A protein has these predicted regions:
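Outer-membrane beta-barrel transmembrane strands
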Residues: 2-18, 23, 29, 63
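Gram-negative outer-membrane beta-barrel transporters
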Residues: 23-33, 49-140, 181
C-alpha cells in the first residue's frame, strides 16, 4: 500500500512591475518530502516484460531558483497593436533517499525547464498570434529497481502556435498547431535507447460562442 506523502514548502520571491504590463520576478524555493511517491520499473516474467508500478521512497529534498518576466511593446496608438515577450526559466536540484539505492534525482523532475512565449495582438482587427516554446531537461521517467537501470526521458523542446480571431463580439475562431518541431521523444536505459518515437503534428480548430 502507498503512504500519503508529506511535503514542507518554503519559497522567497522578489517581484518588480515597471509598468502595468511589464514584470520581472526572481524566486528561490525548497521542498522537504517524506514518503514521496514515484513510478518504478521492475522485472516481470513471461509476456509481461518489465512492469511499472508506484512505490514510496524514504524522503526527498528539492531546491532551486526561478526567473520569470514579461515585456510588452506598443506597435500602434494607445496599445491597439502590441507585441509581447514572456519567459520563464527554472533550475532545480533534487535528491531522493531510498532503501537499497544510491541517492539520485526525484522521478519526473527535470533539472531545468525553459519557456518562451512571443505574442502579437491587433485589437482593432481582432487577430491574435502566439508562439510558445517549452524545453525540459533530462529526467528519470521510471526508477529502476531489482537491479534495473533507471529509464531516462532525454531533454526535448516543443514549439506550439496559437491563432485567435474575433469574428464578432460573440463568436471567436481559435486554431492551434502543436509540436511544430516534431522533435523525437527518446527514452534511454543504461545508456541504450529504450524507446524512441515521434509525436507528429497536432491540429485543433474550435469556434467559441458566448451568449
Amino acid at each position: 500500500f502507498l503512504t500519503i506523502s508529506e511535503v514542507i514548502n518554503a519559497d522567497l520571491r522578489w517581484e518588480w512591475y515597471p509598468s502595468e504590463v511589464d514584470s520581472l520576478s526572481v524566486a528561490v524555493f525548497y521542498k522537504d518530502m517524506d514518503d514521496p511517491i514515484e513510478r518504478v520499473v521492475q522485472l516481470a516474467s513471461g509476456t509481461a516484460g518489465n512492469s511499472r508500478t508506484f512505490q514510496n521512497s524514504e524522503s526527498a529534498e528539492l531546491y532551486g531558483a526561478e526567473v520569470e518576466g514579461r515585456k510588452e511593446f506598443n506597435l500602434g496608438k494607445d496599445f491597439t497593436r502590441t507585441l509581447f515577450v514572456a519567459f520563464n526559466g527554472a533550475y532545480i536540484e533534487s535528491e531522493v533517499s531510498a532503501q537499497n539505492q544510491l541517492d539520485r534525482e526525484l522521478q519526473g523532475q527535470p533539472d531545468y525547464t525553459e519557456k518562451l512565449i512571443v505574442g502579437y495582438d491587433d485589437i482593432a482587427s481582432g487577430h491574435q498570434l502566439t508562439l510558445l516554446f517549452n524545453y525540459n531537461g533530462e529526467f528519470i521517467a521510471d526508477v529502476g529497481i531489482d537491479q534495473l537501470p533507471d529509464v531516462l526521458l532525454e531533454a526535448r523542446g516543443e514549439l506550439n502556435l496559437i491563432y485567435r480571431y474575433n469574428l464578432s463580439e460573440a463568436l471567436t475562431l481559435q486554431a492551434k498547431v502543436e509540436n511544430l518541431l516534431n522533435a523525437e521523444v527518446e527514452y534511454t536505459q543504461g545508456g541504450k535507447v529504450f524507446q524512441r518515437y515521434e509525436k507528429g503534428l497536432g491540429l485543433q480548430v474550435a469556434f467559441n460562442w458566448e451568449f
